[in-house]
Amino acid sequence: MKSWSTRPLPQLPGNIEAPQLFDSASKTLRALPVAADASLYVCGITPYDATHMGHAATYLAFDLLGRVWRDSGASVNYVQNVTDIDDPLLERADRDGVDWRELAESQIELFRADMTALNVIAPQQYIGAIEAIQWIVPAVEELIAEGFAYRMDSGDVYFDTVAASVKTPDSSNAGELGAWWLGQISGLSPEEMLPVFAERGGDPERDGKRNPLDPLLWRVERAGEPAWPGASLGDGRPGWHIECTVIARKFLPAPFSVQGGGSDLLFPHHEMGDGHAWALDHTPLAKHYAHAGMVGLDGEKMSKSRGNLVLVSALRAEGVDPMAVRLSILANHYRSDWSWTAELLERSKLRLAQWRAAMEHTSVGSAAQLVSEIRTALAADLDAPTALNAVDNWVGQKATTEHSALDAALASDAIEALLGVVL
């Protein structure tokens, strides 16, 4: 599946040093090793209402991470999936009386356009769940053979969370992930997990399961539903969590550097994905788990189910500059929960205009300090609000020399390369 186009990244003098990123599994701020190669997996959309501001905030958060890595001199291998077959997609298509394939393709294309407009660096691999079925089927068969999965009387296949859990005394030392057990990534107790699991696509009360928290691996064909060849599994379609695990294992090292997504994916999605990976090859899925906060509207979480969405495409259709939208998102720390407001957008429009105007009266020698301050802020857990304030302070300084086109160019390049804002 094609991704989207990416602007060439401006090259800056020097490099960012010692970036740190909060790890959701250890609940600590951890250093990101500055290596020649970095690997990132960010869970993608289910294409039936793209792209709302919550989506955009997540992908901008990890776009910042990719920019920080690249500024450190690393080569970034970035993979993102698309859940192009799932119950919510089928339900929306049925509700609207459209073919689910057409709905998915239209929303994926809209998402691509939104990401291009927001200047989000495209993944090297953009993989649909349907495309990945050819790799998912043998993985599920292997889990059954190893005793980590089981068939229901219906033919559906589930992951056995109890069989796969192996807790060792020192497996979580210093935030390092070792053998998997349920709760290792999220830190939740089984009692805390149950309502969250039910809310986020799980079926804890289904009769015949060995354990209430066992997630679906393979759903056998039902009348009126699409299905694909599943070899010994029978025709059907994959469960949600196994899709990302298999795609990540196909295109990234084991374990890869950072698993990213919204905070609502911490459990069950990332918890179960890591369990699948451990059961398949006794290696953690990722070294580091990072999660973006939730975005609300008028004090409520923005979500498709609630219908309280602010869509990037709708703002673009109204003529809003996508860079003002990007600045609105970056004004909030990526891990914080925040609300979209009209006032926030208006402040961002003004900020963007002021930044652009400042490029016409830039003092000689002023840009190097700005570059340093942006780098320092982003190295500290992607602190975009502090980076934006650094630019504001630089913009607010009165020019003390004749205009320097070189400094203006360096400042503009830094703002684009590090913050993704095109002036």
Swiss-Prot record:
It catalyses: 1D-myo-inositol 2-amino-2-deoxy-alpha-D-glucopyranoside + L-cysteine + ATP = 1D-myo-inositol 2-(L-cysteinylamino)-2-deoxy-alpha-D-glucopyranoside + AMP + diphosphate + H(+). A motif ('KMSKS' region) lies at residues 301-305. Its EC number is 6.3.1.13. It comes from Renibacterium salmoninarum (strain ATCC 33209 / DSM 20767 / JCM 11484 / NBRC 15589 / NCIMB 2235). The keyword Membrane does not apply. Catalyzes the ATP-dependent condensation of GlcN-Ins and L-cysteine to form L-Cys-GlcN-Ins. This is L-cysteine:1D-myo-inositol 2-amino-2-deoxy-alpha-D-glucopyranoside ligase. L-cysteinyl-5'-AMP binds at C43, G44, I45, T46, T58, N81, V82, T83, W240, G262, S263, D264, V295. One of its GO terms (molecular function) is zinc ion binding. Zn(2+) binds at C43, C244, H269. A motif ('ERGGDP' region) lies at residues 199-204. Its cofactor is Zn(2+).
